Amino acid sequence: YDRGHFQSIKTANIKNGWKVVKNWQGTGKGRVRKHDVGIDYIEALTPGAELAVEFSGTAIGLPMVAGPDVGVIEWKIDNGQWKSLDQFTKWSSGLHIPWIYMLEKELPEGTHLLTLRTSNRKNDQSIGYACRFRAFAVNGKLSD
């Protein structure tokens, strides 16, 4: 991505269920790599949490830690169709693994609205419905 950057979680418009966890230290379940602690994350632990964020560019993703408690997230861009993603990886049962999931990679250039929510679905191996990430990974113009 030739214009890739991290957009702050502070730009999110929280509808319900999300909170910023300052200086995140892990959940007590699953190991955490030392470079992933002490960072502010935005986190939702239950189904139905929703937020929206405006961004400018052609791609958006979530740099997250996919641990033992993550579930299936759903998102849409602008007024598009809802899509879903199981965040759980083959390492998630024992580790909050850092992972960047690119939700959209080939959007038309311009300003877009990402709506993100947690669902009531999860991987059979997961113990929860959580989602937590540190920023929005955007390919596009830096916002002012």
Segments (PLM) and residue ranges:
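Glycan-recognition surfaces in beta-rich domains, encompassing non-catalytic CBMs
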Residues: 1-144
